[in-house]
A protein has these predicted regions:
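Membrane-water interface segments at the C-terminal ends of transmembrane alpha-helices
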Residues: 38-45, 82-84, 150-180, 197-199
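An internal, D/E-rich "acidic patch" concept
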Residues: 71-128
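Alpha-helical transmembrane segments of integral membrane proteins
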Residues: 17, 107, 111-144, 160, ...
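Short, small-residue-biased leader/transition segments that mark boundaries at the very start
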Residues: 2-9
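Charged, compositionally biased N-terminal leader segments and the immediate start
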Residues: 15-41
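Cytoplasmic-entry segments and transmembrane alpha-helices of multi-pass inner-membrane transporters
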Residues: 17-26, 132-168
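Hydrophobic alpha-helical transmembrane segments of membrane transport/permease proteins
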Residues: 31-81, 171, 175-188
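Hydrophobic membrane-targeting alpha-helices
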Residues: 36, 40, 44, 135, ...
């Protein structure tokens, strides 16, 4: 038995490594296509996106500047040079946002605050959304389910920008905080974190409730009831645990989407994170910064998808990597 168990573990590890190799290979190809496409599209933008004082420059100065940056070279040469530099950690320099500042350095300063806010928002959404979905699934068609459904419908029916503005309008007065974000004061984190977590609260509650309802109709639940197991034990020890398996798959990607999708909230609260940086760079036509941000966001999204698949398979041993791969 021990030998058989060791062989199963070894086979599972081999399947996992094969699966990871395939997913990473596909992810690299996807990343290459996305970033290269954005790179080409940005080359169609006006050239003022590469100069801070474009309006004061002569045509000769503009052409000399473009030549020094290699923007007059054939497009395949530019793409090849970009990827070679990127592999060495060089994403170029910003010409508008901060003149001659390293794109990599700017991203390294802006990303931590967005990740920190995303972590807080994700934890809050899990703390609220999971118990909410649990009660809705446990008391299906009763008052906890009806109240939870009404809350979910309200969150999903109202445009996000509307309740963002209401949270800011009434929250700043209630907490006595200004509109300029202060990372050293916990009160300034409350409103943006609550705003970012609302959508995920509805998502987790709705899907956990659905998965629990599906699980409650399966044979193992009927068997547990026939053995006299209490409804609370069935709900917590059996239905809830199995219902969480498919939901866990979405947690990494939901977290990373929260970080990436915080553009409006960071701009609304003047948070010096990635969202505000992207808006500013797009408005100022800082093409070098924009392509660096797109590269980072693409990497973040791909990592989230891979982590979600791995979590789902690792948590539930019944799911094999071969089946997971075949299902795609």
């Amino acid at each position: 038995r021990l030998v058989g168990s060791e062989m199963c573990i070894r086979d599972r590890r081999t399947d996992m490594l094969k699966y990871l190799a395939k997913r990473i290979g596909r992810s690299i190809l996807t990343l290459f296509i996305i970033v290269t496409l954005v790179f080409c599209l940005l080359r169609l933008m006006p050239v003022e996106g590469y100069f801070a004082n474009y309006e004061k420059m002569t045509e000769a100065q503009i052409q000399a500047g473009l030549q020094s940056m290699g923007l007059l070279d054939p497009l395949p040469v530019q793409i090849g040079r970009f990827w070679v530099n990127m592999l060495h950690g060089d994403l170029g320099v910003s010409h508008i946002y901060k003149v001659n500042a390293s794109v990599t350095g700017i991203l390294a300063k802006k990303l931590p605050i967005s990740i920190q806010m995303g972590v807080y928002a994700m934890l809050l959404s899990l703390v609220i959304g999971i118990p909410m979905g649990l009660f809705m699934g446990r008391f299906k068609s009763r008052w906890p389910d009806k109240i939870g459904t009404a809350i979910i419908v309200l969150i999903q029916a109202v445009p996000a920008a509307v309740y963002y503005l209401y949270i800011q309008m009434y929250g700043t007065t209630a907490l006595n905080v200004g509109l300029l974000f202060d990372a050293s004061n916990w009160k300034y984190w409350v409103l943006p974190v609550c705003s970012m977590s609302l959508g995920n609260v509805a998502f987790y509650a709705m899907w956990l409730r659905r998965y629990m309802v599906d699980e409650s109709n399966k044979d193992y639940v009927r068997l547990a009831r026939a053995k006299g197991v209490s409804e609370n034990n069935i709900a917590l020890r059996h239905i809830f645990r199995n219902a969480m398996v498919p939901l866990v798959q979405y947690i990494p990607s939901a977290f990373l989407n929260t970080v990436v999708g915080s553009i409006y909230i960071e701009s609304l609260y003047s948070i010096p994170g990635m969202g505000g940086l992207l808006v500013t760079c797009v408005q100022r036509h800082d093409n070098t910064m924009v392509q660096g941000i797109v590269l980072l966001y693409a990497c973040v999204g791909i990592i989230g998808l891979i982590l979600g698949d791995l979590l789902m398979v690792l948590i539930d041993p019944r799911i094999s990597f071969g089946k997971k791969e075949g299902g795609r």
